């Protein structure tokens, strides 16, 4: 199963994102397929924070448009909701130790721990996931 990161969702959603032209076709194929994928709620929160932020986008996504994207993706029959499981803190500690993670790498470690807990591969444009040796990281074709 794939766990999608906020940067992949932003690239798929925003036509002005530098990676939109390559990520969107990959994303459309994911939605058209039957393979399960997940987006944890904390990733959706990050997506909404970034997509609607005037400091990031000259013309941010209207909140209603950003929520419509969230609702369209989560309505897919092969989208499976996931959130931190009962072993999350133990996995987070292990991954932080493995990658010597602190500061800005902690949110990536949180996603990595969710991915490990649910046997997912992380799909992200962020190369920092390569620092977690026990996490399978996939970059969409660019």
UniProtKB/Swiss-Prot annotation:
A Pfam family annotated for this UniProt entry: PIN
Any GO BP annotation: negative regulation of growth
Annotated PINc domain residues: 3-139
Binding site residues for Mg(2+): 5, 108
UniProt-listed InterPro entries: Mtu_PIN, PIN-like_dom_sf, PIN_dom, VapC_family
Keywords, comma-separated and alphabetical: Hydrolase, Magnesium, Metal-binding, Nuclease, Toxin-antitoxin system
Enzyme Commission number(s) from the entry: 3.1.-.-
Gene3D superfamilies with a match to the protein in the record: 5'-nuclease
One MF annotation (Gene Ontology) recorded for this entry: RNA nuclease activity
Swiss-Prot/TrEMBL induction comment: Induced in persister cells in response to D-cycloserine.
Residue intervals passing through the bilayer: none
Record SUPFAM superfamilies: PIN domain-like
The keyword Cell cycle is assigned to this record: no
Domain of life: Bacteria
Cofactor(s) of this protein: Mg(2+)
Uppermost EC category: hydrolase
HAMAP family: VapC_Nob1 (MF_00265)
Recorded family membership: Belongs to the PINc/VapC protein family.
Protein purpose: Toxic component of a type II toxin-antitoxin (TA) system. An RNase. Upon expression in M.smegmatis inhibits colony formation. Its toxic effect is neutralized by coexpression with cognate antitoxin VapB31.
Protein name: Ribonuclease VapC31
Source organism of this protein record: Mycobacterium tuberculosis (strain ATCC 25618 / H37Rv)
């Amino acid at each position: 199963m794939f766990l999608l990161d906020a940067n992949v969702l932003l690239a798929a959603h925003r036509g002005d994102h530098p990676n939109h032209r390559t990520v969107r076709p990959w994303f459309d194929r994911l939605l058209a397929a039957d393979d399960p994928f997940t987006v944890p709620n904390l990733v959706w929160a990050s997506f909404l924070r970034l997509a609607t932020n005037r400091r990031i986008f000259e013309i941010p996504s209207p909140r209603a448009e950003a929520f419509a994207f969230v609702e369209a993706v989560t309505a897919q029959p092969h989208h499976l909701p996931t959130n931190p499981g009962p072993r999350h803190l133990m996995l987070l500690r292990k991954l932080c130790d493995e990658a010597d993670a602190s500061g800005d790498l902690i949110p990536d470690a949180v996603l990595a721990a969710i991915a490990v807990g649910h046997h997912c591969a992380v799909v992200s444009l962020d190369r920092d996931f390569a620092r977690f040796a026990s996490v399978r990281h996939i970059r969409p074709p660019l």
